[in-house]
Amino acid sequence: MNDATFYLWTGIAGAVYTGFAALRYYSLSGTQLISASRAKKMIKSGEIKHVVDVRSKFEWDFGHYPGAVHMPVNVISAERLKKFDKNDGILTLCNTGQRARAGAEKIASFGFKKVYYIDGTYSTIL
């Protein structure tokens, strides 16, 4: 392999890696992973208008973000989302970020444009 071929393949590998790494923060559905500190600022500024807790009822009853709406991933529907404007910022959260991402993607699938999620539990944004 000559130097030009090596650099070509190294560049391609780097681009592919960077692309996949970026998907962690920007999914194809239009949702976005944000830090807890950014979420706090966006809630305070009004950029995020709704906080949706997608955890189970047991987890919700144990504690939740003040003013959050309880909507587990399996009950997210167009009907349940009717009270939200499709241009409002929505933040989903759970305990680890996995269900929050699934919930965010489900909400975005109903045409919501500004849907964010965080890794970690609600207490990280208190």
Predicted feature locations:
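Flexible, polar/low-complexity N-terminal or interdomain linker segments that lie immediately upstream
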Residues: M1-H50, V54-F62
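Short histidine-centered beta-strand/loop micro-motifs
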Residues: D61-G63, L81-K82
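A broad detector of short, well-ordered amphipathic alpha-helices
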Residues: S37, P66, Q98-A102
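Non-transmembrane, membrane-adjacent beta-strand/coil modules in membrane-associated proteins
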Residues: V73-N74
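Catalytic cysteine-centered active loop of the rhodanese-like fold, especially the PTP/DSP P-loop
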Residues: S77, L81-L126
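Short, structured coil segments at secondary-structure junctions
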Residues: H64-P66, G111
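Conserved beta-strand scaffold positions in the cores of enzyme catalytic domains, especially
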Residues: V51, A68-H70, V115-Y117
